[in-house]
Each structure stands twice: as C-alpha cells, then as structure tokens.
C-alpha cells in the first residue's frame, strides 16, 4: 500500500464508553454521517455495535440505505431534512426521519405515511427546525393525526466555544429545549452533541446523546486529553534526493530551501485529503522525527525536508506518520478544521481496522 489510514478499534470503543460514562450513561446515537467523518461508515458502525450502540445518525437517505445494505439492521435516524420522495422511501425502509416543518407533516398525513418521527426544533442554530414557540401546536398536530412521534431534538451551535458568551448561549439553548420537553415522555429526547457531552455534562437533557467527532478524540478543534487517538494516516517514502541551498520546491516556487538539504517525496496529496494549507506549518513523523512539509502540496505528492540526524538512515519504502490526533492538535494553522479535514480523506486512502 502507498497510503492508508489505521483505525484503532479498541481505542474507539474506549472513547465511546468513556463519553457514555461522562453523559451519565445515557443511550448513545452514533453519528456515522459523511462516511463516519471519513473513516468508513460501515466499519465504524460495526465497531459501535460492539459497545451496545443501537441507533445511528446519518445525513440523508442514501447514507441510511448504504448501512442497511451492508447488513446494519439497527435503527437509523436521518438527521438532515428529506425531500418528499425520500420520506416515502424512508417510511418503507423503517428509517427514522427528522421533521422540521408543517409542510413535511402535512405531506405525511396526505400520503398516509407514518414513519418514526423525530421533531427538530431550532433553539439557536438557525438552520433546520420548528420555532420553539410552535412546539405545543406541532406536537398536538402529531397527536391529532396519529403520527408516530418517537423523538424530539435540537442542535447546539457553539457548545465547543470557550468564552463566557458562548457558554451562556449554549445554556440558553438548553433552557429553551427544556421548556419543550419538560412534560413529554418519548423514546428519544436529545440535544447534546459531542461538545455538549464534554463541556456541559451537568446540563444534559433527555435520554439520548449524539456522539460524532468526540468518538475520534476531539472536542471542537482540540484533542480531548482523556480520550485516545483512534486514527493514523500513514504513507511511505517514494523518492529521496539531496539538493542545494536556494532550490525552489514545488509549484509556484513559493518555498526556497534555506540550506543544502535532503528532501523526500510521499505518495499523498490534496486528492487524498492532505489539505494545501498544511504546506505552511504542517509536518510528518519519520521514526518520531519531525519532518517539515515544504513547498505546495500537490494533487498526488507531498515533499518533506528530512532532518540531518536521519538523512543518512532513511530509505525508499520507510513508513511515515502523516496525520494523527496529536499532530492535528499541535498544528497552529488558522484554516485547520478537524471535521473538514477528516471528511475530506480521499477514497484512495485505504481504511484498515487494527
């Protein structure tokens, strides 16, 4: 293999159980949308089943069908909005659906469809969801039309923020949600996402928490200290060469070598998910030695500067650690967003469970 990602099964299970403990042992909804944040939705879902995760969250019907066709028979919730034809198919397949508007409810009634419904309320995200003030009317409509209302949920927009203002806003969202669900007895009531679990575990409402990026050891853009690294992107040295000081490296001649150097080429580029912004400040590890990424990252290749202490010991085919949670945590690059990076891991990168 040229480039691959190793997924640590036991560390993933540890992280899920640790976060479940922090969430006062609430039931876990495993969010495996966007190919489980780039790591492989089917593989991750199968691991989560081993720690008693029985409900999975996806973005759309297509992702739900992918899980079902891979043999995942557990409950699946489409967290995003669905088109009318998707609501029809979801009902046939027994997939739970998020409903955010009266128009969707009226469509279900008009077509005599009765899927498992989770009503979504907008407590401050300003994306999808009913208005909080309409809660009583919407819930009453479901009851009067014998709709199968199994859940109510909302989404925290800034629970990974670290200021007093962001904390207060999150608490306001939780309080709004509390007013909706206070006297309800439903199978699924949920508002807490990963950062909601780690940062607001004393304020968790309901009987379910949604666990996504937290499984992979992150709260927001920072690694959670008590969680374990679960993924490592690795590659191999493809080419090695010694060059003179002042040589330009890669497209655009933006980088000039400050001294006579040894550089190596890795068979991974932005087509594989190694973002171009890592050209400034990014690094990889060879035998625990930090090697700076130099020049613009190319579509299929990346150049690194090899430190003098290992330049005579490396060889073509040597293994390179390109990215793991600790490297991402150490990078001081404003453009870096862990979610964006993970979901951008390309299909050429083989996913391997270890």
Swiss-Prot record:
One of its GO terms (biological process) is D-alanine biosynthetic process. The active site is at 33 (proton acceptor), 251 (proton acceptor). The keyword Isomerase applies. Substrate binds at residues 127, 299. One of its GO terms (cellular component) is cytosol. CDD domains: PLPDE_III_AR (cd00430). SMART domains: Ala_racemase_C. Its cofactor is pyridoxal 5'-phosphate. It catalyses: L-alanine = D-alanine. Keywords: Isomerase, Pyridoxal phosphate. InterPro entries: Ala_racemase, Ala_racemase/Decarboxylase_C, Ala_racemase_C, Ala_racemase_N, Ala_racemase_pyridoxalP-BS, PLP-binding_barrel. It comes from the Bacteria. It holds the Pfam family Ala_racemase_C. Catalyzes the interconversion of L-alanine and D-alanine. May also act on other amino acids. NCBIfam families: alr. Belongs to the alanine racemase family. This is Alanine racemase. The lineage of its organism: Bacteria, Fusobacteriati, Fusobacteriota, Fusobacteriia, Fusobacteriales. The gene is alr.
